């Protein structure tokens, strides 16, 4: 498993926004995102990240405690040790107090000529 140094998430909110801080779960620890900009109201784009500097066993974007949050587009940029930075995109989803979106993706495999 690679050591994740930091990540940044960009979310375009669909038709259901939320008022709460955006949180994520990292290895079963619930944390707020840092270095945030934008918003989570309908049509707004939110950006935030976190410098974790740890091996990622699990990582998920967590739904709000009350109501629903519709995510139209989700992009996560990863910076892991000993690998070039990479990004992953996720399909639209709706989160609530019982749902999470798994946003961890292993780094792409190295390619080489044969």
Model-derived features: where do they sit?
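Regulatory, non-catalytic segments
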Residues: 1-114
């Amino acid at each position: 498993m690679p050591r994740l140094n930091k990540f940044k998430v960009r979310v375009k909110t669909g038709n259901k926004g939320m008022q709460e801080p955006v949180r994520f779960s990292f290895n079963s620890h619930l944390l707020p995102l840092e270095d945030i900009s934008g918003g989570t109201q309908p049509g707004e784009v939110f950006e935030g990240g976190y410098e974790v500097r740890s091996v990622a066993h699990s990582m998920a974007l967590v739904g709000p405690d009350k109501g629903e949050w519709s995510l139209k587009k989700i992009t996560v940029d990863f910076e892991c040790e000993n690998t070039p930075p990479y990004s992953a995109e996720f399909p639209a989803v709706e989160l609530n107090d019982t749902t999470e979106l798994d946003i961890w993706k292993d780094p792409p495999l190295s390619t080489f000529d044969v």
